[in-house]
């Protein structure tokens, strides 16, 4: 804390501390006597003898004589601040030289002010305009990620609001009929209400959408592996947190949660790669003379033995083939989570198809999807006589209680087909992932969801306190975005 003092001259004018003047005398009164004893002027005089009052700010004319009838006043000649802290240097020989020098020189001669080191200027060989552009780009990337995280939470909230509306609709009695309403009638009424406000997303009815269990992966800005995300999603659903899921997971109350089944390190490390339009061109494959050829390099497709290679047939009849890397590159990588016509595994040697089967944990293809892919190969004159089509994928097959194994295609047919008919997931476009699914809900639910995550806050009277995000609704512990929804039999807003 800096203290600055001046003093009054004999003509009652204020003299600044940077000028020299004669020491005024103040009449000795009981008040002055009390102040002199209280402030302990003798201690200040001792400090003057030890530190040579150059920059200390204590300066006397004739000394302070408390016994005399008219003691001289003490003059604080400089302001006391952090920058005026001093240390004594070269006290020996310089004292004699300074005794004969001027008062101004004595004040500056033997003491060196302690000052903070000057900041080192940042230097870069790049021009300042380029550095400014880089800073703006970094800010845009961070803001984009924050916005996409909020939109992902918005998608979760609007899904919950949708199920809440359906729950209220099925419990609402029929006002036009006095007879008790049957369960079938209630479900039919809920489906009718859903059909009025819902709309389809894809023109191709045979297209297979991304499985619901990987929905969180698609809308996650980091595209963390959907299976891992659902483990944390279950913890969030069972908690009493009022924060949206992704906010809770990354920076909210759940940022310290670390599960044994999936550690936080594994969750952050296993992020699925989502290809853009230019990136996926390296994986596009065409059929020439019945053989699989890379469209970009014109080389025959050769799947390395001991590794797993996967394929995806888009709704525009484009084939993509690449090597599977668990937790990094999977079926959803090719089209950034968009709908597909067929997906599965493939084995090819020198461009000749040796084996193909429809196993995909992300898309859960059905027999109909597999037939579409077989028709695609036949249309391009691929010889399927010796092609193996009934292999078992060790990652996706299930073991029943009796010990027998069934391929995941049969599981998809029994459990996933109804799920896929009810849910369509247009999570992305050709330019990359986006949250377009929010537009498939009624406008009032969209508005409420945006308000919940504070992306479009409602104007209210008074100031809004900054206490984190608005609570996310949970109509029922059983109603949430998880694989359990596939067994509920409720209609989807997008079907």
From Swiss-Prot:
InterPro entries: IQM (IPR044159). The keyword Glycoprotein does not apply. It comes from the Eukaryota. Expressed in roots, rosette and cauline leaves, and at lower levels in stems, flowers and siliques. It is found in: Cytoplasm; Nucleus. Keywords: Cytoplasm, Nucleus. Induction: Down-regulated by salt stress and treatment with mannitol. One of its GO terms (cellular component) is nucleus. Signal peptide: none annotated. Residues 131-160 form the IQ domain. The keyword DNA repair does not apply. Its main location: cytoplasm. Residues 89-122 are annotated as: Disordered. May be involved in biotic and abiotic stress responses. This is IQ domain-containing protein IQM5. It comes from Arabidopsis thaliana (Mouse-ear cress). The lineage of its organism: Eukaryota, Viridiplantae, Streptophyta, Embryophyta, Tracheophyta. The gene is IQM5.
């Amino acid at each position: 804390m800096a203290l600055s003092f001046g003093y009054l001259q004999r003509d009652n004018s204020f003299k600044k501390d940077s000028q020299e003047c004669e020491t005024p005398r103040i009449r000795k009164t009981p008040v002055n006597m009390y102040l002199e004893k209280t402030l302990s002027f003798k201690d200040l005089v001792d400090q003057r003898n030890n530190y040579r009052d150059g920059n200390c700010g204590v300066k006397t004319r004739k000394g302070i004589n408390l016994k005399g009838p008219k003691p001289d006043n003490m003059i604080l000649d400089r302001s006391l601040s952090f920058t005026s802290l001093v240390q004594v240097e070269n006290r020996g020989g310089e004292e004699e030289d300074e005794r004969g020098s001027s008062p101004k020189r004595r004040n500056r001669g033997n003491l060196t002010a302690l000052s903070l080191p000057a900041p080192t200027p940042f230097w870069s060989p790049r021009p300042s305009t380029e550095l400014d552009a880089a800073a703006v780009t970094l800010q845009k990337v961070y803001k984009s990620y924050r916005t996409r995280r909020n939109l992902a939470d918005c998608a979760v909230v609007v899904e919950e609001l949708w199920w809440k509306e359906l729950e209220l609709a099925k419990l609402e009695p029929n006002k036009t009929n006095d007879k008790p309403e049957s369960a079938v009638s209630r479900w039919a009424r809920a489906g009718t209400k859903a059909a009025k406000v819902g709309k389809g997303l894809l023109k191709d009815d045979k297209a297979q959408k991304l499985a619901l269990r990987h929905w969180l992966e698609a809308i996650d800005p980091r595209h963390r592996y959907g299976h891992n995300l659902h483990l944390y999603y279950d913890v969030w659903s069972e908690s009493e947190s009022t924060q949206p899921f992704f906010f809770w997971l990354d920076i909210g109350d759940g940022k310290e949660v670390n599960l044994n089944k999936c550690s936080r390190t594994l969750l952050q490390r296993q992020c699925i790669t989502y290809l853009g339009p230019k990136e996926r061109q390296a994986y596009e494959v065409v059929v020439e003379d019945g053989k699989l050829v890379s469209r970009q390099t014109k080389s025959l497709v050769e799947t390395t033995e001991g590794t797993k290679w996967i394929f995806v047939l888009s709704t525009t009849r484009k084939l993509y083939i690449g090597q599977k890397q668990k937790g990094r590159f999977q079926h959803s990588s090719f089209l950034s989570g968009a709908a597909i016509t067929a997906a599965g595994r493939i084995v090819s040697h020198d461009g000749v198809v040796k084996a193909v089967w429809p196993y995909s944990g992300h898309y859960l293809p059905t027999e109909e999807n597999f037939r579409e892919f077989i028709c695609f190969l036949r249309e391009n004159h691929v010889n399927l006589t010796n092609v193996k089509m009934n292999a078992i994928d060790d990652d996706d097959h299930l073991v029943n209680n009796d010990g027998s194994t069934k391929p995941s295609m049969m599981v998809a047919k029994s459990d996933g087909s109804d799920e896929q008919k009810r849910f369509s997931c247009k999570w992305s476009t050709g330019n990359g992932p986006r949250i377009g699914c929010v537009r498939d809900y009624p406008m009032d639910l969209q508005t409420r969801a945006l308000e919940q995550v504070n992306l479009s806050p409602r104007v209210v009277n008074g100031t809004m306190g900054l206490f984190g995000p608005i609570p996310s609704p949970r109509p029922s512990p059983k109603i949430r975005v998880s694989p359990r929804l596939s067994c509920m039999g409720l209609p989807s807003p997008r079907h």
